[in-house]
Structures are given as C-alpha cells and as structure tokens.
C-alpha cells in the first residue's frame, strides 16, 4: 500500500521543533523499555498488545495509535501541522514490518488524519539523539540514591547476617522506576533525608506492620497485605494505581515500599507499569529488575499479575488471553510453562505442579 508519508532527517525535525513545536506531534513507535531509556522531549510512546495487533488484521484504528482522547481530538480537528513517526534506527519506512507498530501507525494516520501531514524520521531516535542530544531526555543510570547508611539496622529488617552489617535490600537508597515513582524498603521509608532528597511527597506502604514514620510530612496510602501465597494483592491494584496517578498529576512523587522492597511493593510497581503503559508482565518485570535487581514477587503474586495482564492488554478478549497462572491451579492442564521469573516465597502445590516452573524458586526474608 502506497502511503502519503514524507521524510524528515534529524536536521529537518530540529528545525520543525524550533519553529512549530506546539503544532508537531511526535509518535515514538519503539518499545516501552527503549522509550523510557531515552526519547525526544515531548514525544508520545505508541504501544498496543499483541492481541489487539492480531485482531486488527493490518488496519489499526487511530484510537489505538493515539489513545489519549485530548490528543486524538486535536489531531482529528487539524490542530497539528505535522505528525512525525519514528522508531529506533530505520532508514526508510518501506523497510518496516507490515504488521509492526510503525507501519500500522502510518496506515492509521493516513486513513483517519488526512488533514495533517505525516512524516517519517529517517534514522530514527538513534540518529536524532546523536545529532540533537539537547532535544532528548535520557534516564540516568538506574541506581539507588547514594547516601551514607547508619550502621544500625531497624529491628523490623531481619537480615540473616551479622548484626553489624546492612542487608542487601536496605543498601543504597530508593530506586527510580519512573520520574515520579520510586521503589525500596521499609528502612528507606524511615530515612527522611533520603525521601526529601528525592522529592518524595507520598508513600504507599504495602505491609500490615511497617509503621508510617512521617505522617505529618507526607501523604500515605496503606495496603495491608502479607507476603504469602494466600494474600490477595490484586484487589488493591486499581486503588494503588489511581493513588500514584493522583500524586503524579499533582506534580508529586511516590515511594512504594514493603519490608524489603522485593515482593509486595515490587508487585504494585509492576501492576502500575502494566496498566498505565499497556505492557506485558515480562517487559515490566525486566524494566523494574534492571533498576532493582533483587525484586522477586512471590509465586501467588506472579499469578495475580499474569491474570491482571490478561485484563489490561485485552479487556474484551478474555477468551484469547486467559491467564497462564490458572494453569497451575488446573490439575488437568498440560501446560508446560507458567513464567520464567524467580519468586520469593516457597510454594508446595500438589499434583506435581512444580514441574510447570522453569526457574528455581528462591527464598528470601518477608518482603
């Protein structure tokens, strides 16, 4: 199919942004992971699930390309002078996969936004960031805040180590998941200097027994769940996500913690990424793990996240997206794989359900 898409190089886009930035819509067709690692300032990440892609059969609707109602309304009203599509490094649109995000986005725009000129960025983000780094935003190295730690460890943080050492999950500081979302342990939540240095304005305490140390200084949200295979953490997902969004919309930052910042709080962060960015669990897991390598939601929480994935990515396609987590509970199933992530709580299922796991189950302190 011949599509009326113009070509811009890095210099052309730079000139366009300097002259008419407010009338230029940048649609970044790379993965969520790549987009968050670095992107052109003001660009919007285009993502949709595999099931939505398959059901579209090559003709994706504009509501999937630009899900934001306000942006889509402006686009259809002709408020944008130009829409620029980009991927990582493609030299030409002709080389894009026919069922790939870039080609589907171009097709939808040419069909439904005919009043706006559509361009393809030659060389993609890679070429533009090399030529115009000042117009790009790159995430800093995913490490926690480096502040001096006291030699004493709170009684609530059992380390299993000598009394004079700091457990791994309390070392460093809270890690940045997104610019407004941080993850860490109960110890970090007790360090007002760390929280203030990061600009934290609210905390989500995902535990039944960790205290809220500074209720007069920060806004708190309590999610009183235990870290065991009986706990229903998924019933809190939407409430936690809405809380995070409310703090973000107010210009604040949220720190999510449990006891060790390994299982419960990590689960909440994963659920947030999955729903708000429409990404699969494995992609969200890898994204968070690169920032806090010790995350390890327990077996049950992983199952609940998989069920949440099927709801988030295909709300109207439940028959096609049944949760693999249910395979573990169905004694008659022949499924051989559930997920490939380490989990923190040892599970003792019946009927040889352990055979479904490809990764070893590790143990850790209550987290």
Swiss-Prot record:
Reactions mediated catalytically: O-phospho-L-tyrosyl-[protein] + H2O = L-tyrosyl-[protein] + phosphate; O-phospho-L-seryl-[protein] + H2O = L-seryl-[protein] + phosphate; O-phospho-L-threonyl-[protein] + H2O = L-threonyl-[protein] + phosphate
Q: Write down the EC number.
A: 3.1.3.16, 3.1.3.48
Q: Which residues form the Tyrosine-protein phosphatase domain?
A: 173-314
Every copy of the Rhodanese domain together lies at 20-137
- Write out the entry's keywords from A to Z: Cell cycle, Hydrolase, Nucleus, Phosphoprotein, Protein phosphatase, Ubl conjugation
| Primary localization | nucleus
Report the record's Gene Ontology biological process terms.
Answer: cellular response to chemokine; cellular response to hormone stimulus; endoderm formation; intracellular signal transduction; negative regulation of apoptotic process; negative regulation of cell adhesion; negative regulation of cell population proliferation; negative regulation of DNA biosynthetic process
Any keyword Nucleus? Answer: yes
- For this protein, what post-translational modification is recorded in UniProt? Phosphorylation at Ser-359 and Ser-364 by MAPK1/ERK2 and MAPK3/ERK1 reduces its rate of degradation.
Q: Where is the active site?
A: 258 (phosphocysteine intermediate)
Give the tissue specificity: Brain. High level expression seen in the cingulate gyrus within the retrospinal cortex, ventral and medial divisions of the anterior thalamus and the medial geniculate nucleus. Expressed at moderate levels in the parietal and temporal cortex. Expressed in the cerebellum.
MF terms from GO for this chain are: growth factor binding; MAP kinase tyrosine/serine/threonine phosphatase activity; mitogen-activated protein kinase binding; phosphoprotein phosphatase activity; protein serine/threonine phosphatase activity; protein tyrosine phosphatase activity; protein tyrosine/serine/threonine phosphatase activity
Inducing or repressing factors? Exhibits night/day variations with a 100-fold increased expression at night in the pineal gland (at protein level). Up-regulation is due to a large degree to the release of norepinephrine from nerve terminals in the pineal gland and cAMP signaling pathway.
Family, as annotated: Belongs to the protein-tyrosine phosphatase family. Non-receptor class dual specificity subfamily.
This protein's name: Dual specificity protein phosphatase 1
Q: Identify the species of origin.
A: Rattus norvegicus (Rat)
């Amino acid at each position: 199919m011949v599509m009326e898409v113009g070509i811009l190089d890095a210099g052309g886009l730079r000139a366009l942004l300097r002259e008419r930035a407010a009338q230029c819509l940048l649609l970044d067709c790379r993965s969520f992971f790549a987009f968050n690692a670095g992107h052109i300032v003001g660009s919007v990440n285009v993502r949709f699930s595999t099931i939505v892609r398959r059901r579209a059969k090559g003709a994706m609707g504009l509501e999937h390309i630009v899900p934001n109602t306000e942006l889509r309304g402006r686009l259809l009203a002709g408020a944008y002078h130009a829409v620029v599509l980009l991927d990582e490094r493609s030299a030409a649109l002709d080389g894009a996969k026919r069922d790939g995000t870039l080609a589907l986005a171009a097709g939808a725009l040419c069909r439904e936004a005919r009043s706006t000129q559509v361009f393809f960025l030659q060389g993609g983000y890679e070429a533009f960031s090399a030529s115009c780094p000042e117009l790009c935003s790159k995430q800093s190295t995913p490490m926690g805040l480096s502040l001096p730690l006291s030699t004493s460890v709170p009684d609530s943080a059992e380390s299993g180590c000598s009394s004079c050492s700091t457990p791994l999950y309390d070392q460093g500081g809270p890690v940045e998941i997104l610019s407004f979302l941080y993850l860490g342990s109960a110890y970090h939540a007790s360090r007002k200097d760390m929280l203030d240095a990061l600009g934290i304005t609210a905390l989500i305490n995902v535990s039944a027994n960790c205290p809220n140390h500074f209720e007069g200084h920060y806004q708190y949200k309590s999610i009183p769940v235990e870290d065991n295979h009986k706990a229903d953490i998924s019933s809190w997902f939407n409430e936690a996500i809405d809380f995070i969004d409310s703090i973000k919309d107010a210009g604040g930052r949220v720190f999510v913690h449990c006891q060790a910042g390994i299982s419960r709080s990590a689960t909440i962060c994963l659920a947030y990424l999955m729903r708000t960015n429409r990404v699969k669990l494995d992609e969200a897991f890898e994204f968070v793990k690169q920032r806090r390598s010790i995350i390890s939601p327990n077996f049950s929480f992983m199952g609940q996240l998989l069920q949440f994935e099927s709801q988030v990515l295909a709300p109207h396609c439940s028959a096609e997206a049944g949760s693999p987590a249910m395979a573990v509970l169905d004694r008659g199933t022949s499924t051989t794989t559930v997920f490939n992530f380490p989990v923190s709580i040892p599970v003792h299922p019946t009927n040889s359900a352990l055979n479904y796991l490809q990764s070893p189950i590790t143990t850790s302190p209550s987290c």
